[in-house]
């Protein structure tokens, strides 16, 4: 498994962090992608542009069979190198399982409208069926690579 995960800090830490999907979560300043408090957040674009890009490059170098991108959203809106790296990954053959914010954000719209992307909307009504839907799509995608 390649790619990245983003996750909140351990209570009372509200900040958001990023780590490679294949490593344990890290709560270090160099992994912090956004500072949050109860009312607002302050993203650190340079962390996406350095660590985020590095994680995606390492995933390619080590030829991971599946990339995780959890999640893509508004924190990355000024992380142009990271955006470019994500879009390059979409051109590759490696399947990607990602979570994309629904909000209309130009760089996310580029992902949502990409010809290699299949969106699976999740709602309260269908969320119990989503794991089997994802498994079916990934199984089909991985078979194409063999």
Question: How should each PLM-predicted stretch be described?
Answer:
Residues 2, 64-68, 95-97:
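Residue-level preference for the first positions of well-ordered beta-strands
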Residues 36-88:
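Phosphate-binding/switch loop-helix module in NTP-utilizing enzymes
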């Amino acid at each position: 498994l390649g790619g990245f995960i983003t996750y909140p800090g351990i209570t009372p830490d509200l900040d958001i962090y990023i780590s490679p999907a294949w490593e344990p979560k890290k709560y270090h300043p160099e992994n912090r992608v956004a500072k949050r408090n109860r009312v607002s957040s302050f993203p650190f674009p340079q962390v996406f542009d350095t660590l985020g890009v590095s994680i995606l490059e390492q995933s390619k170098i080590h030829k991971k069979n599946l990339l995780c991108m959890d999640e893509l959203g508004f924190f990355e809106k000024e992380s142009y190198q990271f955006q470019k790296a994500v879009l390059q990954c979409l051109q590759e053959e490696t399947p990607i399982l990602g979570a994309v914010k629904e909000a209309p954000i130009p760089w996310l719209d580029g992902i949502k409208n990409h010809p290699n992307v299949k969106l699976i909307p999740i709602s309260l009504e269908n969320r119990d069926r989503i794991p089997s839907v994802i498994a079916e799509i990934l199984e089909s995608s991985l078979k194409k690579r063999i």
